[in-house]
From Swiss-Prot:
SMART domains membership: FBOX
CDD domains documented for this protein: F-box_AtSKIP19-like (cd22164)
Residues of the F-box domain: 18-65
This protein's encoding gene: FBL9
Taxonomic classification: Eukaryota, Viridiplantae, Streptophyta, Embryophyta, Tracheophyta
Stated name of the protein: Putative F-box/LRR-repeat protein 9
Species assigned in the record: Arabidopsis thaliana (Mouse-ear cress)
């Protein structure tokens, strides 16, 4: 059956034909580009043609930003002198409309503050390998993000309870907290107590390799009465493992 002439999608190409990517409808181009990360768009996709560049400049393209860093670039000169400026450009293109950002490895105090200063409407912040800046960067950013609803942190060193308290006090709308430790774990309930004390609105909490005991667990269950899901994975000081659904 032949395709309808009113179809919004381009007809299939015949053998020997070539697609003119510049003639794709803007909504289809946008759908394609949204499957790429911020770096791929800014380094490559926006250079395909003028029409693609126009789509890439649209603030609606930058409501969600995924910054995926290749492992071989971690700690490289290119990461900080090429990639970081591109990521700042992505934040600028959102024109204050950024709602969600996920960052792999490219985490430092100045960049986190750059995001927070220009994205007061941010709802989700996800960072991987943020050990060098957890004490200042995440806390300083959180103080400028009162609408933040989800915080997802993967870190190597211990989190201080004072830092979590500031986050909880600065982000009253926080509903999801994920703390994933990839380093050494110490038996300690301070983090759990900080969560219980300052984050009563949590609905979803995930702790990976946390040193809390049953005392900390009970404090969380009492201090966060709206919890729907509590995921405890490799938390070796308690007997409950897996997801607790209330």
């Amino acid at each position: 059956m032949s395709s309808s002439s009113s179809s919004p999608f381009p007809q299939a190409m015949k053998n020997g034909e070539y697609r003119n990517w510049a003639e794709l409808p803007p909504e289809l181009t946008s759908s394609i580009l949204l499957r790429l990360g911020a770096i791929e768009i800014l380094q490559n996709a926006q250079r395909v043609c003028k029409s693609w560049r126009r789509v890439c400049q649209d603030p609606s393209m930058w409501r969600k930003i995924d910054i995926r860093i290749k492992e071989n670039l971690v700690n490289s000169v290119e990461l900080f002198y090429v990639i970081e400026p591109l990521c700042c450009r992505a934040v600028d293109l959102s024109q204050g409309g950024l709602l969600e950002i996920n960052i792999d490895y490219l985490v430092n105090t100045s960049f986190l503050n750059y995001i927070a200063d220009r994205s007061s409407n941010l709802r989700r912040l996800g960072v991987v390998d943020c050990a060098p800046v957890l004490s200042r960067g995440v806390v300083e950013a959180a103080m400028k993000l009162p609408l933040l609803e989800e915080l997802d942190i993967t870190y190597k060193s211990s989190i201080r309870e004072q830092e979590l308290k500031v986050v909880g006090q600065s982000c009253p709308n926080l509903r999801t907290l994920k703390l994933n430790c990839t380093g050494d774990v110490k038996c300690c309930d301070k983090v759990a107590l900080a969560i219980a004390e300052t984050m009563p609105g949590l609905r979803h909490l995930q702790l990976f390799r946390n040193g809390l005991s049953e005392t900390g667990l009970n404090a969380i269950l009492e201090g966060c009465p709206h919890l729907k899901n509590l995921g405890l994975h490799q938390c070796l000081n308690i007997n409950i493992v897996g997801d607790i659904v209330k």
